[in-house]
């Protein structure tokens, strides 16, 4: 009888320990994408010196786009085409961007030219694009050519009524959404706060995708934050998320959080001065 109880207790402890360990060491995934690569050599270099899991989004029209593509590939970063797209405002976008009213042939041509400049890209995200990503016709043309080019799509969510994700799924293109903007404000404390928001979002939802820019405060926060990343958070590249069959993040194991999104931009997402136009 004593042996029976000892065995039962031992098995219970082993089971409980395994369950606790599985919960304790489950890691949230944090993906970081740095937009606007290709304009500033110094800042771009600091981004490329970060761990390879930090993904880079290169603007095809940027003067150093081809060079950055090769450097990022050499250093094993996941690369995105940061495609200029028409905003709701009248801000001029870079040459070769996507605007309302383009024909399907024109969209195809511009995407192919962008891919030729950034040939190692595995996906695309939008630079501005609050008008473009809300336009069903334009997004249908875009997702069709992205499927043909075997490119994924990351919706930067510059407007709440974006149809990019819906149409991408209809067209068979793997798509994910941005969750947190790291540097809507370039203030150091604000960037630090947004980085912590991304960590909390990853803990709650299992996955967080944060977008930032090659600015001094953003670089400083990321260097320190990545170096001291909590044990329960795993830094991952965008490719690993896109290729994962389970694109939608799993529900939290225990619902102890408020159902309030991480503090990022709020609809309509447009009044973000530091995200407008050609990067400074």
Regions found by a protein language model. Give the residues of each.
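N-terminal signal peptide c-region/cleavage motif recognized by signal peptidases
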Residues: 21-23
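Active-site beta->alpha N-cap acidic-glycine motif
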Residues: 26-91
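Bacterial N-terminal signal peptides that target proteins for export
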Residues: 2-13
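Substrate-binding cleft of extracellular glycoside hydrolase catalytic domains
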Residues: 72-120
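Hydrophobic faces of well-ordered beta-strands that scaffold small-molecule active sites
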Residues: 30-34, 54-56, 79-83, 124-126, ...
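C-terminal domain-boundary segment and adjacent tail
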Residues: 148-158, 217-280
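Active-site mouth loops of central-metabolism enzymes
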Residues: 30-34, 95-105, 184-189
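Catalytic domains of cell-wall/extracellular-matrix polysaccharide-remodeling enzymes
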Residues: 104-196, 201-203, 213-234
């Amino acid at each position: 009888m004593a042996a029976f109880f000892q065995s039962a207790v031992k098995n219970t402890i082993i089971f409980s320990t395994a369950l606790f360990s599985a919960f304790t060491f489950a890691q949230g995934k944090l993906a970081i994408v740095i937009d606007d690569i290709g304009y500033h050599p110094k800042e771009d270099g600091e981004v490329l010196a970060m761990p390879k899991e930090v993904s880079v989004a290169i603007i095809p029209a940027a003067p150093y786009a081809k060079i950055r593509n090769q450097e990022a590939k050499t250093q094993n970063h996941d690369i995105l085409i940061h495609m200029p797209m028409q905003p709701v405002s009248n801000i001029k976008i870079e040459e070769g961007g996507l605007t309302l009213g383009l024909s399907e042939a024109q969209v195809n041509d511009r995407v192919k030219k962008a891919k030729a400049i950034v040939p190692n890209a595995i996906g695309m995200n939008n630079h501005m694009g609050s008008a473009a990503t809300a336009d069903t016709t334009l997004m249908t043309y875009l997702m069709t050519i992205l499927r043909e080019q075997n490119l994924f799509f990351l919706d930067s969510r510059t407007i709440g009524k974006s149809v990019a994700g819906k149409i991408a799924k209809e067209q068979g293109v793997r798509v994910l959404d941005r969750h947190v903007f790291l540097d809507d404000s370039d203030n150091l404390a604000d960037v630090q706060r947004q980085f912590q928001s991304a960590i909390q979002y990853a803990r709650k939802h299992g996955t967080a995708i944060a977008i930032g820019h090659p600015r001094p405060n953003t670089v400083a926060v990321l260097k320190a934050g990545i170096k001291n990343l909590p044990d329960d958070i795993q830094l991952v590249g965008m490719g690993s998320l896109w290729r994962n069959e389970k694109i939608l993040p799993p529900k939290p194991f225990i619902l102890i959080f408020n159902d309030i999104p991480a503090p990022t931009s709020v609809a309509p997402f447009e009044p973000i001065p530091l995200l407008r136009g050609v990067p400074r």
